[in-house]
Amino acid sequence: MIKKRIIPCLDVKDGRVVKGIQFKGLRDIGNPVDLAMYYNEAGADELVFLDISKTEEGHSLMLEVIEQTASRLFIPLTVGGGIQSLDDITQLLNHGADKVSLNSSALKNPQLIKQASDKFGRQCICIAIDSYYDPERKAHYCCTHGGKKMTNIKVYDWVQQVEQLGAGELLVTSMGHDGMKQGFDIEHLAKIKSLVNIPIIASGGGGNAQHFVELFDQTDVSAGLAASILHDRETTVQSIKEVIRQGGIAVR
């Protein structure tokens, strides 16, 4: 059995880690390098850095922060946010990222997924999906630009397309659950997992350790992303893992 992973997510804006609720009301959490070191020592299995200002404001890739962090990390680092080209990916990998996460640019140019997968290997390419449920159309749609713009691309169609193009992993954020701490969108995540064979990282809604037990018990996703509950020190990575183990689920 593949052991489940717990992955802290650091949303970085203007060089600082921030967190909001449903992608709004951002508040300052701290220095990304310091927080990365804290989670590295606290038992995190991987880290995700999302530069949420990059797509919206178009500033340069945060290469210095990534290099400082990666040089001291002993766990894999995934970096996303505003990656537009193969050259961007090359720079990030050269500065210490282990994987890159593509979202808006992949929706705009799906062939970027194939090109990146062919050049760097699919294990390096994670596709981030900000999933919004539109009650009027009764379907989940992909959003871009940090969750601010909704597309007409349906999530269930998109996940199958990106797998065929060479994505090695999906990072799925349920926008309606983001920061709410009321549990993951189990039904939605289970449906996505039934459509693809690549690993899925679930994001949005993890409010306590039991939510992660439910996630891994009721879906076959590979990892759970956590932000608010860890940043606010409501719990720790090890505490979450201990509860998961008590639930009879193998975790790293």
UniProtKB/Swiss-Prot annotation:
Q: In which pathway does it act?
A: Amino-acid biosynthesis; L-histidine biosynthesis; L-histidine from 5-phospho-alpha-D-ribose 1-diphosphate: step 5/9
Q: Which GO terms describe its cellular component?
A: cytoplasm
Q: What is its main location?
A: cytoplasm
Cite a single GO MF annotation.
lyase activity
Q: Which residues form the signal peptide?
A: none
Q: Which UniProt keywords apply?
A: Amino-acid biosynthesis, Cytoplasm, Histidine biosynthesis, Lyase
Enzyme class label: lyase
Q: Name one Pfam family in it.
A: His_biosynth
Query: Per the record, what are the reactions this protein catalyses?
Result: 5-[(5-phospho-1-deoxy-D-ribulos-1-ylimino)methylamino]-1-(5-phospho-beta-D-ribosyl)imidazole-4-carboxamide + L-glutamine = D-erythro-1-(imidazol-4-yl)glycerol 3-phosphate + 5-amino-1-(5-phospho-beta-D-ribosyl)imidazole-4-carboxamide + L-glutamate + H(+)
Q: What is its EC number?
A: 4.3.2.10
**Source species, domain of life:** Bacteria
Gene Ontology terms: biological process: L-histidine biosynthetic process
Family per record: Belongs to the HisA/HisF family.
Record-linked HAMAP family? HisF
Classification via PANTHER family: IMIDAZOLE GLYCEROL PHOSPHATE SYNTHASE HISHF (PTHR21235:SF2), IMIDAZOLE GLYCEROL PHOSPHATE SYNTHASE SUBUNIT HISF/H IGP SYNTHASE SUBUNIT HISF/H (PTHR21235)
Name used for this protein in its record = Imidazole glycerol phosphate synthase subunit HisF
